[in-house]
Amino acid sequence: MIPANSTIRSLFLEGPAGRLESLLNAGSEKATHAAVVCHPHPLFGGTLHNKVVFHAMKALNSFGFPVLRFNFRGTGLSQGEHDHGIGEVEDVRTALDWLKSEFHLPLIFARFSFGAAVGLRAACADPQVRATIALGVPIAPVAADTEEPRVYSFEFLESCDKAKLFVSGARDQFGPRAKLEALVASIPDPKKLVVIEGADHFFEGRLREMREAIEAWVKEAVGSQPSVLGRL
């Protein structure tokens, strides 16, 4: 069993738009992977402290993996301005590059909502990323009367051959089940879709089930076992 490490390190990464506020949950000396988790849309309150992001971090950290969370540009103490999902892709690359140089381990890339939309492309193109986890994929168009109307494209997934986990709520208002099932069916293996009954986009009241889905899949895809302490 891998002992848990409860150390949390606060740091700033040097990104193309300035410093990115970050938190690193330390891993075990026997860690086999390192991971990053991206937060949801900053214009709608998304930060690295989001509940879904936190529980995804805890799931990955329970395996002894060091896990990085960061605020996208213009969010929290991160410098720069929100760039409508364009410059944020470079923020993801900054986080991935930092993890590579810091740990020299294969990477797992996890993200929620907006983080999934902007980060998947960077993760699929990075040879050191071995597995990806998408939570609450915003596959439905964002309403035109919102502050940032947008339709996200996931066509690049058709050439992404990394291990892929999708976790969605059956009542996700931004990721209709039929559309998500069609997307997953169109992309190459290895892949897995877990739909949590009764859950909405934010997994309200279903965070434990979401976390358990991540842990079960990591055991399958990576072959690691979570620490009992890491589940606290």
Question: How does the language model describe each region?
Answer:
Residues 1-30:
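N-terminal cap/lid segment of alpha/beta-hydrolase-fold proteins
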Residues 28-69:
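Short, surface-exposed "cap/lid" segments of acyl-processing enzymes
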Residues 52, 82-102, 121:
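Alpha/beta-hydrolase active-site loop
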Residues 111-119:
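Gly/Ala-rich beta-loop-alpha elbow adjacent to hydrolase catalytic centers
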Residues 141, 170-175, 201-202:
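Acidic catalytic loop of the alpha/beta-hydrolase fold
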Residues 159-161, 166-168, 172:
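Short beta-strand/loop motif that positions the catalytic acidic residue
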Residues 186-202:
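Catalytic histidine neighborhood in serine/cysteine hydrolases
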Residues 199-211:
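Catalytic histidine-centered segment of alpha/beta-hydrolase-like enzymes
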